[in-house]
From Swiss-Prot:
It comes from Ureaplasma parvum serovar 3 (strain ATCC 700970). It comes from the Bacteria. This is Uncharacterized protein UU149.
Length: 98
C-alpha cells in the first residue's frame, strides 16, 4: 500500500512541477517570436490549455488518493471494532461542488 500512495504522491508532485514550468514559459523571451503577436498569443493559449489540463489531472489524482485513503481508514476502523456505520459513512460522502 505504501508503494501505491508513494506512486500517487509522486504523480501529484510531477503534475505540480509541470504546472509551475508551463506558467514560467508564458511570455518567455526565448520561445516568443519577435514581432509576431498572433503566434505568441497562440503559444500562450496552448500553454494555458496545458495548465488547465494538468490542473484537472491533478484534481482527479488527488480524489483517487482520498478515496484510497478513506478505504484504508474504513478497513482499519472495522478491524479495530468500529461497528457503527454512522461513524464510517462521513468518510465516503463526496464534497459538494463549489
Amino acid at each position: 500500500m505504501e508503494k501505491i500512495v508513494g506512486f500517487i504522491v509522486n504523480i501529484i508532485n510531477v503534475q505540480k512541477q509541470m504546472i509551475k514550468d508551463l506558467k514560467e514559459l508564458k511570455n518567455h523571451k526565448d520561445i516568443m517570436v519577435k514581432d509576431h503577436e498572433k503566434l505568441n498569443d497562440m503559444l500562450n493559449s496552448m500553454i494555458d490549455e496545458a495548465v488547465k489540463n494538468y490542473k484537472i489531472a491533478l484534481k482527479n489524482i488527488t480524489e483517487i488518493l482520498n478515496v484510497h485513503l478513506n478505504c484504508v481508514l474504513y478497513n482499519h476502523n472495522l478491524k479495530c471494532g468500529v461497528k457503527d456505520e454512522k461513524l464510517l459513512l462521513p468518510l465516503f460522502k463526496r464534497k459538494k461542488a463549489s
